[in-house]
Design a protein with these regions (language model features):
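Charged, flexible cofactor/metal-binding loops and thiol motifs
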Residues: 236-321
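A short, proline-enriched helix->beta-strand linker immediately N-terminal to the Walker B motif
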Residues: 168-172
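P-loop NTP-binding/switch modules centered on Walker-like glycine-rich loops
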Residues: 175-179, 183-265
Length: 321
């Protein structure tokens, strides 16, 4: 049985100007112990996908389809039962550690609350376990710092605290939404190394959302490329980097500086901007930015199909249309 099964997921938002389609008929599976990287430009639907999994959509949002965690259906689950899963079986690290911690509460208060809610621990036992987790994420002098407030920590240390909080209950699935974006480059690599280390120790699965293809290469087993709320390509990480099949994926990779290629190389960019999700074009959403488009691209939405074993691609070029 897969750890996570998402089938035909659609996420919509009602606005004064009409309905916005953030996630469109999206399906994928994750195995236990797998790290899935999700990449795409801003507005591609990455964050709304995981917020749909967590049932943390804005009040004007709705979702349809199926989301199963170890066979348990999450769509339609009462809030009380979903609250017992969030922070327990599924945990999430949000993008900005500067704003996700409550500035009015000590780190001890914020961490012990999680264990007192989900593990029915008393305060003393919860604090002891919280200290152990702060040590696990390499917070120096954890015993002396646990009673401090978030503003007394650097950005990198705050992100380590967020990771520690997310892992307190040893979740089956950890969702990390741009966990390194707000951090200095020198701090990003140790955070990724830490997540790899903790994943191996706890035998958990990770969904890693990021714009950074270097982060994807360093942590992922498989990669899902999203564009305009849809999956346009899915493959094992090494396969995707060596043999990208979709024009959008190739565009993303060609825009990244390479250190493994001798001599100078001109970086290319993808022309234009992502489409307005409220007014998606007929056919392929990438057509207006693609220099390889065919006539059928403006008429018919491409289907995600096998490019090679384990490698899926949604492109009319690929399938000889």
């Amino acid at each position: 049985m897969a750890l996570l099964e998402v089938s035909n997921l659609n996420t919509r938002f009602s606005t004064p100007d009409g309905e916005v389609s953030a996630v469109n008929d999206l399906s994928f599976e994750m195995a236990k112990g797998e790290t899935l990287g999700i990449v795409g430009e801003s507005g591609s639907g990455k964050s709304q996908l995981v917020l749909s999994i967590m049932n943390l959509l804005a009040t004007n949002g709705s979702r349809t389809g199926s989301i199963k965690l170890q066979g348990q259906e999450l769509v339609g689950l009462p809030n009380r039962r979903m609250n017992s899963i969030r922070g327990n079986r599924i945990a999430m690290i949000f993008q900005d550690p500067m704003t996700c911690l409550n500035p009015y509460l000590t780190i001890a208060r914020q961490m012990t609350e999680v264990l007192m809610l989900h593990r029915n621990m008393d305060y003393r036992a919860a604090k002891t376990h919280s200290l152990q987790m702060l040590d696990a994420v390499h917070i120096p002098d954890a015993a002396g710092r646990i009673n401090r407030y978030p503003h007394e920590f650097s950005g990198g240390m705050r992100q380590r605290v967020m990771i520690a909080m997310a892992l307190l209950c040893k979740p089956d699935l950890l969702i990390a939404d741009e966990p390194t974006t707000a951090l200095d480059v020198t701090v990003q690599a140790p955070i990724i190394d830490l997540m790899n280390e903790l994943k191996a120790e706890m035998d958990m699965s990770i969904i890693m959302i990021t714009h950074d293809l270097g982060v994807i290469a360093g942590i992922s087993d498989n990669v899902m490329v999203m564009y305009a709320g849809r999956v346009c390509e899915y493959a094992a990480v090494h396969e995707l980097f060596k043999r990208p099949a979709h024009p959008y994926t190739r565009g993303l990779l060609s825009s990244v500086p390479r250190l493994d290629i001798a001599g100078s190389q001109r970086l290319t960019s993808i022309p234009g901007n992502p489409p307005n999700l409220q007014y998606l074009p007929t056919g392929c959403a990438f057509q207006e930015r693609c220099d390889e488009r065919l006539a059928i691209c403006s008429q018919q939405q491409p289907v995600l199909q096998a490019h090679s074993p384990g490698h899926l691609n949604a492109c009319h070029l690929e399938h000889g249309s």
